[in-house]
């Protein structure tokens, strides 16, 4: 059996309504994406910590609908547009999609990822290419962080070079737990992972169990008092700026902090906020993203 994939690019104000209308009219599945993804105009859609995002679609959105082969895309789209009060049917493209073993196809798209000098991130259906390396077994899932994104890679490279056995580490915005797990495998103890998303916390716990990594996870209100040798936060620039005082206060005097989720063009602005508390600069850049790293000044 084959399917049809309908792709429509349109303004934010119509994206969610159109996706709902397409589902009501018989689409098998519909997703809304950033039409500017992987470009300088990409817009992350995350709320500030503890807040709901102020928008639910991107300024330039792409609606992707999977249709049964007997559905006529143009007719369906015209009906959906009429349903939401759009007089003119938006421009669209259609391609045929053959039925496949979707599990096998998805798995084939995720190969082991080498990072740094001795790290491999390995999906569960693959064998580790180098059994003597630092192996993190991690499957793509709901929580952010599998090593494929430049910001995750940057933070992992920094941790590999920075963590010393016995140091305490706080991973704030832990997502899948990948950075916390790596810190533990590098010898850190204790390691704490914090995230605002309960689903991410649960995913991180499961990933740590799979990797035999003793990491404590929780929501922000469970973040322990006290200071850490290392604090790492791979989030986004706005939350990083809002939480600068809190994150810096979690670093021991003389301890180190690494920040990512920051585009190169945002680096100076983020660094300026943290400069009140730590000596910080761009540690490394990769594919337009940066990792900022610094040391908390000693108390006097």
Swiss-Prot record:
GO terms for molecular function: protein-lysine N-methyltransferase activity. The keyword Phosphoprotein does not apply. InterPro entries: Ribosomal_L11_MeTrfase_PrmA (IPR050078), Ribosomal_PrmA_MeTrfase (IPR004498), SAM-dependent_MTases_sf (IPR029063). It comes from the Bacteria. It catalyses: L-lysyl-[protein] + 3 S-adenosyl-L-methionine = N(6),N(6),N(6)-trimethyl-L-lysyl-[protein] + 3 S-adenosyl-L-homocysteine + 3 H(+). Keywords: Cytoplasm, Methyltransferase, S-adenosyl-L-methionine, Transferase. Its main location: cytoplasm. Its EC number is 2.1.1.-. GO terms for cellular component: cytosol. One of its GO terms (biological process) is methylation. S-adenosyl-L-methionine binds at residues 152, 173, 195, 234. Belongs to the methyltransferase superfamily. PrmA family. Methylates ribosomal protein L11. PANTHER family: ELECTRON TRANSFER FLAVOPROTEIN BETA SUBUNIT LYSINE METHYLTRANSFERASE. This is Ribosomal protein L11 methyltransferase. It comes from Burkholderia lata (strain ATCC 17760 / DSM 23089 / LMG 22485 / NCIMB 9086 / R18194 / 383).
